[in-house]
Amino acid sequence: RIRCGAKIDNMVHIAHNCDVGEDVIIAAQTGLSGSTRVGRGAILMGQVGSAGHLRVGEGAFVGTRAGLHRDVPDGVRVWGSPQMEERAWHRSVAALSRLPGLLRRLRAVEKRLGLRRSRSEAEKEETE
């Protein structure tokens, strides 16, 4: 069911038994799995994907390319795949850019402490 005022962009898939509330905005290339309910005034940005039988709350915001695997409460902003609240997502994205430097520092500390393993030892340990 698609209710009054809903705006749906191109290449959006709305599966069986979905309920899209009033004044919802769904951007391009979004897919709603079966029995997903989207509350009034929610916004789903482009390339969002949802697992089935979920509820996106009223006034919720789902950022671009988010992968929904659980309900989104009313008024909450989520991003990412898997979904996380906006503040946590921003912190995660910022941390990713710092990983190469942190790995270099960790290797230097390991070397200084004599904890450095060879690559073959690490690979062997991972397969056990």
Predicted segment positions?
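Long, leucine- and charge-enriched amphipathic alpha-helices
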Residues: 84-127
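Structural signal for interior beta-strand "rungs" in well-ordered beta-sheet cores
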Residues: 1-85
